[in-house]
Amino acid sequence: MRKIMLMAVAILLCSTAFAQATYADIGFNDIATVFSELNDNERVVFLIRHGERGRDYSRAGLLTENGKAQARMVGEKIRNGEQAFYAHSDYDRTKQTCENIAIGRADEFIHEEWGILNGDWYRKDLDVIRQRGWDNWETLSQWAYEGGHEEGFYNLEERSKEWLDSLKSHLPDMKRINVLVSHDYMVTAMAIYASDKQVDLHYWVNRKWINYLAGVAIIIDKDGNMRFKTVRGLDSGVLAR
Protein backbone atom coordinates (compact mmCIF):
# COMPACT_ATOMS: atom_id res chain seq x y z
CA MET A 1 0.00 0.00 0.00
CA ARG A 2 2.82 2.40 0.91
CA LYS A 3 4.50 1.69 -2.43
CA ILE A 4 1.27 2.38 -4.31
CA MET A 5 0.76 5.64 -2.42
CA LEU A 6 4.31 6.80 -3.21
CA MET A 7 3.79 6.00 -6.88
CA ALA A 8 0.53 7.96 -6.88
CA VAL A 9 2.24 10.98 -5.31
CA ALA A 10 5.03 10.80 -7.89
CA ILE A 11 2.53 10.69 -10.74
CA LEU A 12 0.64 13.64 -9.27
CA LEU A 13 3.82 15.70 -8.94
CA CYS A 14 4.84 14.93 -12.51
CA SER A 15 1.38 15.82 -13.78
CA THR A 16 1.43 19.10 -11.87
CA ALA A 17 4.85 20.01 -13.24
CA PHE A 18 3.69 19.25 -16.78
CA ALA A 19 0.57 21.37 -16.34
CA GLN A 20 2.62 24.29 -15.09
CA ALA A 21 5.03 24.02 -18.01
CA THR A 22 2.14 23.92 -20.44
CA TYR A 23 0.42 26.90 -18.82
CA ALA A 24 3.66 28.94 -18.75
CA ASP A 25 3.80 28.42 -22.51
CA ILE A 26 7.23 27.75 -23.95
CA GLY A 27 8.10 30.72 -26.16
CA PHE A 28 7.34 33.56 -23.75
CA ASN A 29 10.52 34.81 -22.06
CA ASP A 30 10.55 36.46 -18.66
CA ILE A 31 10.75 40.20 -19.26
CA ALA A 32 13.48 40.57 -16.62
CA THR A 33 15.71 38.08 -18.43
CA VAL A 34 15.26 39.77 -21.80
CA PHE A 35 15.99 43.14 -20.20
CA SER A 36 19.13 41.89 -18.47
CA GLU A 37 20.49 40.44 -21.72
CA LEU A 38 20.34 43.71 -23.66
CA ASN A 39 23.65 44.96 -24.99
CA ASP A 40 24.70 48.52 -24.18
CA ASN A 41 24.31 49.54 -27.84
CA GLU A 42 20.81 48.07 -28.18
CA ARG A 43 17.44 49.73 -27.66
CA VAL A 44 14.30 47.93 -26.63
CA VAL A 45 10.62 48.62 -27.17
CA PHE A 46 8.33 46.53 -24.98
CA LEU A 47 4.90 46.27 -26.61
CA ILE A 48 2.66 44.70 -23.98
CA ARG A 49 -0.94 44.30 -22.97
CA HIS A 50 -2.25 46.39 -20.08
CA GLY A 51 -2.59 45.03 -16.53
CA GLU A 52 -5.63 43.29 -15.11
CA ARG A 53 -8.80 45.32 -15.66
CA GLY A 54 -12.27 45.30 -14.22
CA ARG A 55 -15.49 44.60 -16.14
CA ASP A 56 -15.70 48.03 -17.74
CA TYR A 57 -14.37 47.55 -21.28
CA SER A 58 -14.92 51.18 -22.32
CA ARG A 59 -12.22 53.79 -22.72
CA ALA A 60 -12.87 54.86 -19.14
CA GLY A 61 -12.41 51.32 -17.78
CA LEU A 62 -9.68 51.12 -15.16
CA LEU A 63 -7.21 48.60 -13.80
CA THR A 64 -8.05 46.64 -10.71
CA GLU A 65 -5.85 47.15 -7.65
CA ASN A 66 -4.21 43.87 -8.59
CA GLY A 67 -3.60 45.20 -12.10
CA LYS A 68 -1.83 48.25 -10.69
CA ALA A 69 0.32 46.02 -8.48
CA GLN A 70 1.14 43.80 -11.46
CA ALA A 71 2.31 46.79 -13.47
CA ARG A 72 4.48 48.09 -10.62
CA MET A 73 6.05 44.65 -10.29
CA VAL A 74 6.88 44.59 -14.01
CA GLY A 75 8.46 48.02 -13.62
CA GLU A 76 10.65 46.70 -10.83
CA LYS A 77 11.76 43.84 -13.08
CA ILE A 78 13.08 46.26 -15.70
CA ARG A 79 14.44 48.93 -13.36
CA ASN A 80 17.99 50.10 -14.00
CA GLY A 81 18.12 53.79 -13.09
CA GLU A 82 17.76 54.86 -16.72
CA GLN A 83 14.74 56.97 -17.68
CA ALA A 84 12.31 55.17 -19.99
CA PHE A 85 9.77 56.46 -22.51
CA TYR A 86 6.11 55.46 -22.28
CA ALA A 87 3.25 55.45 -24.78
CA HIS A 88 -0.29 54.14 -24.49
CA SER A 89 -3.64 54.09 -26.25
CA ASP A 90 -6.46 56.52 -25.45
CA TYR A 91 -7.93 54.01 -22.97
CA ASP A 92 -7.42 54.93 -19.32
CA ARG A 93 -6.23 51.46 -18.32
CA THR A 94 -3.27 51.56 -20.71
CA LYS A 95 -2.18 54.93 -19.32
CA GLN A 96 -2.58 53.54 -15.79
CA THR A 97 -0.41 50.58 -16.74
CA CYS A 98 2.35 52.84 -18.04
CA GLU A 99 2.12 55.03 -14.97
CA ASN A 100 2.46 52.11 -12.57
CA ILE A 101 5.33 50.58 -14.53
CA ALA A 102 7.02 53.98 -14.24
CA ILE A 103 6.44 53.89 -10.47
CA GLY A 104 8.04 50.45 -10.32
CA ARG A 105 11.04 51.72 -12.28
CA ALA A 106 11.27 54.91 -10.17
CA ASP A 107 10.91 56.90 -13.41
CA GLU A 108 9.48 60.28 -14.19
CA PHE A 109 6.27 59.52 -16.09
CA ILE A 110 7.17 60.79 -19.58
CA HIS A 111 4.43 59.56 -21.87
CA GLU A 112 2.45 60.07 -25.06
CA GLU A 113 -0.89 58.85 -26.39
CA TRP A 114 -0.54 56.98 -29.69
CA GLY A 115 -3.44 56.10 -31.95
CA ILE A 116 -1.57 53.07 -33.32
CA LEU A 117 -1.90 51.46 -29.88
CA ASN A 118 -5.71 51.57 -29.73
CA GLY A 119 -6.13 47.90 -30.60
CA ASP A 120 -7.82 48.05 -34.01
CA TRP A 121 -4.62 48.06 -36.06
CA TYR A 122 -5.25 44.70 -37.71
CA ARG A 123 -8.99 45.16 -38.26
CA LYS A 124 -9.73 46.47 -41.75
CA ASP A 125 -13.52 46.82 -41.64
CA LEU A 126 -15.15 46.78 -38.23
CA ASP A 127 -18.66 46.80 -39.72
CA VAL A 128 -17.95 43.61 -41.68
CA ILE A 129 -16.32 42.03 -38.63
CA ARG A 130 -19.40 42.70 -36.52
CA GLN A 131 -21.90 41.70 -39.21
CA ARG A 132 -20.20 38.34 -39.69
CA GLY A 133 -19.72 37.60 -36.01
CA TRP A 134 -15.94 37.86 -36.18
CA ASP A 135 -15.45 40.29 -33.30
CA ASN A 136 -14.19 37.64 -30.89
CA TRP A 137 -11.06 35.90 -29.68
CA GLU A 138 -11.77 32.73 -31.67
CA THR A 139 -11.78 34.50 -35.03
CA LEU A 140 -8.86 36.80 -34.26
CA SER A 141 -6.60 33.94 -33.24
CA GLN A 142 -7.58 31.73 -36.17
CA TRP A 143 -7.04 34.59 -38.63
CA ALA A 144 -3.59 35.34 -37.19
CA TYR A 145 -2.41 31.74 -37.64
CA GLU A 146 -4.30 30.63 -40.74
CA GLY A 147 -5.23 33.80 -42.61
CA GLY A 148 -8.53 34.24 -44.41
CA HIS A 149 -11.25 36.66 -43.29
CA GLU A 150 -9.81 39.15 -45.79
CA GLU A 151 -12.98 41.23 -45.85
CA GLY A 152 -12.51 42.14 -42.20
CA PHE A 153 -8.81 41.80 -41.39
CA TYR A 154 -5.56 42.92 -42.98
CA ASN A 155 -2.79 40.50 -43.92
CA LEU A 156 -0.90 39.75 -40.69
CA GLU A 157 2.63 40.01 -42.07
CA GLU A 158 2.04 43.10 -44.20
CA ARG A 159 0.16 44.95 -41.48
CA SER A 160 2.76 44.06 -38.83
CA LYS A 161 5.53 45.45 -41.03
CA GLU A 162 3.51 48.64 -41.53
CA TRP A 163 3.24 49.03 -37.76
CA LEU A 164 6.96 48.50 -37.31
CA ASP A 165 7.67 51.09 -40.01
CA SER A 166 5.44 53.51 -38.11
CA LEU A 167 7.36 52.73 -34.94
CA LYS A 168 10.65 53.57 -36.67
CA SER A 169 9.39 57.08 -37.38
CA HIS A 170 8.97 57.62 -33.61
CA LEU A 171 12.39 56.30 -32.60
CA PRO A 172 14.27 59.63 -32.76
CA ASP A 173 12.00 60.96 -29.99
CA MET A 174 12.17 57.84 -27.85
CA LYS A 175 14.63 56.53 -25.25
CA ARG A 176 16.85 53.47 -25.09
CA ILE A 177 14.22 51.78 -22.91
CA ASN A 178 10.63 52.14 -24.10
CA VAL A 179 7.30 50.76 -22.89
CA LEU A 180 4.25 50.76 -25.17
CA VAL A 181 0.96 49.52 -23.72
CA SER A 182 -1.89 48.35 -25.93
CA HIS A 183 -4.74 45.83 -25.92
CA ASP A 184 -5.19 42.10 -26.35
CA TYR A 185 -6.18 42.11 -30.06
CA MET A 186 -3.17 44.18 -31.05
CA VAL A 187 -0.66 42.41 -28.83
CA THR A 188 -1.90 38.90 -29.64
CA ALA A 189 -1.50 39.47 -33.36
CA MET A 190 1.94 41.04 -32.99
CA ALA A 191 3.14 38.24 -30.69
CA ILE A 192 2.04 35.63 -33.22
CA TYR A 193 3.81 37.53 -36.00
CA ALA A 194 6.98 38.24 -33.99
CA SER A 195 7.33 34.59 -32.92
CA ASP A 196 6.81 33.33 -36.48
CA LYS A 197 3.61 31.73 -35.15
CA GLN A 198 5.51 29.69 -32.56
CA VAL A 199 3.72 30.96 -29.45
CA ASP A 200 0.62 29.02 -28.50
CA LEU A 201 -2.28 31.44 -28.62
CA HIS A 202 -4.62 29.13 -30.55
CA TYR A 203 -7.69 30.32 -28.68
CA TRP A 204 -10.17 28.82 -31.13
CA VAL A 205 -8.60 25.40 -30.47
CA ASN A 206 -7.39 25.38 -26.85
CA ARG A 207 -8.74 28.56 -25.21
CA LYS A 208 -5.27 30.11 -24.76
CA TRP A 209 -5.09 33.89 -25.00
CA ILE A 210 -2.49 36.58 -24.32
CA ASN A 211 -2.03 37.30 -20.63
CA TYR A 212 -1.94 40.71 -19.02
CA LEU A 213 1.47 42.40 -19.30
CA ALA A 214 2.69 39.95 -21.95
CA GLY A 215 3.74 40.84 -25.46
CA VAL A 216 6.81 41.46 -27.57
CA ALA A 217 10.26 42.93 -26.98
CA ILE A 218 11.44 44.69 -30.13
CA ILE A 219 15.22 44.91 -29.84
CA ILE A 220 16.99 47.36 -32.13
CA ASP A 221 20.76 47.34 -32.72
CA LYS A 222 22.96 50.33 -33.53
CA ASP A 223 22.36 49.83 -37.26
CA GLY A 224 18.58 49.85 -36.88
CA ASN A 225 18.11 46.10 -37.33
CA MET A 226 15.22 44.63 -35.37
CA ARG A 227 14.83 41.28 -33.65
CA PHE A 228 11.94 40.06 -31.55
CA LYS A 229 11.35 38.12 -28.36
CA THR A 230 7.94 37.36 -26.96
CA VAL A 231 7.87 38.31 -23.28
CA ARG A 232 5.78 37.81 -20.16
CA GLY A 233 5.67 40.20 -17.24
CA LEU A 234 3.82 37.73 -15.01
CA ASP A 235 4.36 34.02 -14.37
CA SER A 236 2.80 33.11 -17.73
CA GLY A 237 2.40 34.73 -21.11
CA VAL A 238 -0.88 32.89 -21.59
CA LEU A 239 -4.34 33.06 -20.08
CA ALA A 240 -5.95 29.62 -20.21
CA ARG A 241 -9.77 29.81 -20.09
Across the structure, where does each feature detected by a protein language model lie?
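Active-site-adjacent alpha-helix immediately C-terminal to a catalytic or transition-state-stabilizing loop
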Residues: 161-225
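Sec-dependent N-terminal signal peptides
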Residues: 4-13
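Flexible, surface-exposed loop/gating regions in the mature catalytic domains
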Residues: 55, 82-85, 99, 109, ...
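C-terminal segment of classical bacterial N-terminal signal peptides
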Residues: 14-19
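Active-site-proximal alpha-helix that buttresses catalytic centers in soluble enzyme cores
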Residues: 20-115, 143-154, 200-230
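Active-site metal-binding loops of divalent metal-dependent hydrolases
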Residues: 50-51, 184, 234
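Low-complexity, Gly/Ser/Thr/Pro-rich intrinsically disordered linker/tail segments
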Residues: 225-241
